[in-house]
């Protein structure tokens, strides 16, 4: 294609949000295996290296993102331990930070050695903990970084050595005081000029609300409920802070009551409305979005970053125009316009129930009572009797979306079909198959009588539909990993992260 720009074209833009970041999280079933299979084949398994991050940073520049919280799960080598990672971040002018459980740019899961260093306990093991932080600060002198203050457990747990509310408050206050003194000394800078953020995530919010003094120059980053709904934003006093505020927002999640690590189906209107709300509360310094893989989260990630760059570019009441513009950008004017209707319907259907939640089950329950900590697959709340057969209507709506998507695909230029499969067909068809699998299995259980099930044609027909839908998910996933673009995306798609029921 020929690209051109008008003579004397000029544009002057500046971002609405200063730090626009991506957190590569829960990478175990997508980004990490893909990195090992493709971009970083020469590295050891678990080392997400400069090959992966170079490709990620190229995408981030296209999205106008400028900050990274690197992948940090157990089994993933720490970002700073892999040769070339820091250098490639510097070459793209990417600011490097770390998540709510990784203060001072430290990956505690893989870098803290309890056998050698003792407990990750600031109260009882302060000298060793401070040495651990100091080492990383010295390594990052001169680097463009955003330092996370505070302390939690090794990985997403409570701070050790404190039990009462008073101990938690005093302990965390001491941590912040120590960290700031360390940053000022080791970086040789006025501490008020060092970019810092404090993230009151889960139990830390209670400590903050009990009277924790977070210095005025530190940004406060508020969190959603892990499912896309912000639970706290800056009040009038906090809005006057020099350090400003920000948000940490999930487009994927691992944890109770249930993960969603397969597809990215958060409703675009919700993303838009929540980010507009954050902006209205002057939380404009730093926005970070949690994704298990940026390719899987392509549209919502683009929406999030477009708003971070220009908050006026998208309004909640007109978010469909943004979706249409994105579809046109990816697949051309005619196809993009035709896709708006089915994709809007798709997000409505997944808004009713995420595909990952169709088993009506929960995770991380008491293993004494639940095998693997998982509740069993249950009947859904979709009724085959009430509301004009709600169950069948839900399945029929999915079939209509599939028909409309299929019609667009038939007319698509061949060179666009791989991208179409990844961004449109796989999530639509796989979500539809999950709905069929769960709801037809439910129908079979309700129709069939236990003593005559194998002679009940209606029950057997529903059971076969359920089984075939499961096979369809397997087939689609195999195509994504092994045939799409000649195997370019091998290892990126896992239909059952954490081996949860699918």
For the regions a language model picked out, list residue spans one by one:
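Feature activates predominantly on carbohydrate-active enzymes
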Residues: 1-123, 141, 197-200, 211-228, ...
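Gly/Pro-rich turn-and-neighbor structural signature
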Residues: 2-6, 11, 73, 80, ...
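Glycine- and acidic
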Residues: 33-43, 68-71, 115-119, 154-166, ...
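Hydrophobic alpha-helical scaffolding
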Residues: 46, 75, 119-126, 162-169, ...
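Generic, well-ordered alpha-helical scaffold segments in large soluble proteins
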Residues: 56-63, 85-88, 92-95, 99, ...
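Substrate-binding cleft of secreted/luminal carbohydrate-active enzymes
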Residues: 101, 267-348
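C-terminal non-catalytic alpha-helical accessory regions
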Residues: 323-501
